[in-house]
Amino acid sequence: MASRTEHADLSDLSGDSGFKRIATISLAALGVVFGDIGTSPLYAIRECFHGDYSIPVSQQNVLGVLSLIFWALVLIVSLKYLTFIMKADNEGEGGILALTALIVAHSKKNRHERWFLVGIGLFGASLLYGDGMITPAISVLSAVEGLQIIAPAFKDLVIPITVIILTGLFLYQHNGTARVGALFGPVILLWFAVIGVLGLVEIVRYPEILRAVLPWYGFSFLLNNHLQGFMVLGAVFLSVTGAEALYADMGHFGKTPIRFTWILFVLPALLLNYFGQGALLLFAPQESHHPFYGLVPSWAMIPMVILATSATIIASQALITGVFSLTQQAIQLGYLPRITVKHTSAGHRGQIYVPGANWALMYATIGLVIGFGSSSKLAAAYGVAVTATMLISTILFYYVARDIWRWNKLATNLLVSFFFVIDLAFFGASATKLFHGAWFPLVIGLVLFTLMLTWKQGRSLLLQQIKDRTLTVEEFVQSLALQQPQRVTGQAVYLTANPDVIPIALLHNLRHNKILHSEVALFHFSLERVPRVPNSKKVEIKKYGDGLCRVVARYGFMEYPSIRQVFSLAQEKGLHFRLETTSFFLSREKIVTGLKSKMGLWRKKLFALMVRNALSATSYYDMPSGQVIEIGMQVQI
């Protein structure tokens, strides 16, 4: 997801200035939010009539498929996401992790139900990583495949060119998108304008194709084609992949610009192109192998391949950035260990680069291109992860509507059941492709889900063991009053994962060195289940006397903890520690397995491996490395 754009509640803007502002943000949103769903015309119709589960080209089948696509776009994107799910924002932020955090923050449910909601939310987020691997592969590959339509001799060059483009895209990530990001909106604007016009030309030739807006044709298609018609739903669903991005990017652009852009521009352009492809198939059924490029005049094929490739690169970029943002949120919410997160823009804190995620995506995406060999085969692997995520979003939305908003139970049950049946139908159709590649994103999702649960549970066990081996802050203060250790002049900061207990590093230092600094601050970073915490509420200081105090720094899951910022805010509240002269003490735990618990031995070993490879607190919290002392200890879990 792209960098956060400053926005207020745009729904109350009026007049020329308000319209211009919405238009400006809408143009920016075009290049980020709508790239994925906007490039689906490259392969969605083709897979219905030329894929592994395709059906013959006939008037009734074409009208039926178009009717299903039309109502999928209307019901899933326009109604479900833009009208209802977008209401479930976490202080303006969207996305499945933000939705999960919102439910947990307001939930009064028992422990098991809370874990169920957290579990399905994490699994939904994990599935998006599989989607992030497939989308760049299928999008860029389907665009480059236009070369073999220009000249069959180019067929052997499609895979190498796709690999080169994807390699360049991932290698460029460390530079950020600040310099080239301004081009994204205009390029995608041109893309939608061109595909809309191409479709309109064919619709004018065969206006009867517009009858497909009647839902009867969709029902008739499913009734007449039985199981085969149901399986084609998996290809129909390709037209709405990317709908989750509209919700996930809500925090960057606001609800109004996204809705405005969808209704007035994106949806009409998509429908024109889909219906144009349908009209073409009625005239030229032989074009079913690539109806999108069949709309393009021969003289415009090369420019169109270039434009399509550019659009798919931008769509891929948006998804890659989304994976970076999702990873950062998961770290902040405590579901993944600390890893390197680099900021690529001084002016926009939201523009980040996560090297580990970038290389994993790169190798997986290129491997998919080489392994599957064509966008048609990749389409079989696409969709099941997205449909599962949509199902989970519907379930989570139900709990928000029922428990947080207190909507009428009957109305809520009817509404959510309606969406759930639609999602379940698409999921079932996509799941039929399980042995044709759909297993891949599910396996990736399960791996990430296991890592997230292991880290969360392992941290809980670790903190409990540390708590059992140390003193509470109050007990430590009482011990100082009874027996004062030797004090040395200076300021020391000890990081603590639990604000109510003394960190092991302090006790070890006191036990072995027999000294304590004259001024000691216990620093605790509290990661809240809201996107951002205002600076006025970010730092809380409690002084215990005898030179001891506790500083609690609160950060949201869209923020980046910084010890330098905490020092600055703490000084404003009367804590006069100097960053350049303060010594920082950290605990470095070595995990030893052995204790009996609900966590299996293999997961304990996995957790120990994750701890060893986690980024140090020194780097993550931006501490001055020359002033950090790490004290090691063994902890058995």
Curated annotation (Swiss-Prot):
Q: Does the keyword Cell inner membrane apply?
A: yes
What is the recorded membrane topology of this protein? Multi-pass membrane protein
Tell me the GO molecular function terms: potassium ion transmembrane transporter activity; symporter activity
Q: Which GO terms describe its cellular component?
A: plasma membrane
Going by the entry's taxonomy, the superkingdom of the source organism is recorded as Bacteria
Reaction(s) catalysed (UniProt annotation) = K(+)(in) + H(+)(in) = K(+)(out) + H(+)(out)
Q: Where are the transmembrane segments?
A: 25-45, 62-82, 115-135, 149-169, 180-200, 227-247, 263-283, 295-315, 352-372, 378-398, 410-430, 434-454
Pfam families according to UniProt: K_trans, K_trans_C
Q: Where in the cell is it found?
A: Cell inner membrane
Keywords noted in UniProt: Cell inner membrane, Cell membrane, Ion transport, Membrane, Potassium, Potassium transport, Symport, Transmembrane, Transmembrane helix, Transport
Work out whether the entry's keyword set contains RNA-binding. no
Checking InterPro entries in the record gives: K+_transporter, K_trans_C, K_trans_N, Kup
**HAMAP family xref list:** Kup
Q: Which family does it belong to?
A: Belongs to the HAK/KUP transporter (TC 2.A.72) family.
What does this gene product do?
A: Transport of potassium into the cell. Likely operates as a K(+):H(+) symporter.
- What PANTHER family does the annotation carry? LOW AFFINITY POTASSIUM TRANSPORT SYSTEM PROTEIN KUP, OSMOTIC STRESS POTASSIUM TRANSPORTER
Q: What is this protein called?
A: Probable potassium transport system protein Kup
Which source organism?
Answer: Chlorobium phaeobacteroides (strain DSM 266 / SMG 266 / 2430)
- Which lineage ranks, top first, belong to the organism behind this chain? Bacteria, Pseudomonadati, Chlorobiota, Chlorobiia, Chlorobiales
